[in-house]
Amino acid sequence: GQGSQKVGMLAELAEQFASVEATFAEASKAVGFDLWHIAQSGEGLDQTEFTQPVLLTASIALWRVWLELGGVAPKYLAGHSLGEYSALVAAGSLSLGDAVKLVNLRGKLMQSAVPQGKGAMAAILGLDDAQVVALCQQVSSQAEGSVEAANYNAQGQVVIAGEKAAIEAVMALAKENSGKAIALPVSVPSHCSLMKPAAEQFAEALEQTAIELPSIPVIQNVGAEIATDVAQVRQALTAQLYESVQWTKTMQFIQDQGIQYVAECGPGNVLANLAKRLPNIEKAFPLDSKSRLEDALNAILVAEGKIA
């Protein structure tokens, strides 16, 4: 998801695997601008209309390297927010070209939905989900503006989104209730009702995009469920703009299926670190370097009994 981008991402891996830059070239041709240049120079990387296609392409480049090295296909795929698109590409539901065009548009619509400086997001730590929801409802009812739980990332870690004044009010209340509050450096309040106008326009683009049923089950952000038809894929991608990311439930679903190994295709290791906190996850691997890719590959092959 957004926030994991960094200037120069995948540069070292690109020197070792030609498929990395080839993937960026394929995606760049679809959107009409140079995604690899943005990733390496940082020019425009903080603008969501560029951030989103760059990150999606980086995730798919890592996925392709994983397969190139002989990595096994997972039982399930899931992606956090923007990452749901990467998961759908990996599952053959969306083409890479269509996906990068969609998320480029998604970024533009999200940015235009809320005037610059009006929206905000913050991470609330150390309070349970119900406490955070109650604080959001309290502030919203006092006419301080709209604020909602946007991302349920883990136990004791909820991200809120909404109007700036309301976000600041919830942050203050969280601290009064022995929680921590950290403002996030974003200009767009994702996954809240302020994004409904963007979602309505985005739904039209989704209707015109070829989408297949995923060949590998993709756990959706909204509801933490598996789509059983293409209409549900479209509906979930539309609703995802203004409804909460249910990552805690997603990871619980994975554990309930008996999954013990998790691999993260994207720059950084935020999701792998969240997975490591879960009792039934034996190992969680980030795949953003050759050594990490090889470590994950060997561990999973050993676990499956394919190598000793």
Positions of predicted regions on the chain:
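Conserved functional loop/turn residues at catalytic and ligand-binding sites
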Residues: 81, 210, 258
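Short, flexible loop segments at boundaries between secondary-structure elements
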Residues: 283-307
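FabD-like malonyl-/acyl-CoA
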Residues: 2-133, 137, 184, 261-291
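Generic hydrophobic alpha-helical scaffold/packing signal
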Residues: 171, 219, 238, 251-255, ...
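Alpha/beta catalytic cores of group-transfer enzymes, especially the acyltransferase/condensing modules
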Residues: 3-4, 29-31, 91-243
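A short, acidic, amphipathic alpha-helical segment used as a generic capping/interface helix at domain edges
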Residues: 242-259
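Structured loop/turn residues at beta-strand edges in well-structured enzyme cores
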Residues: 72, 213-214, 257
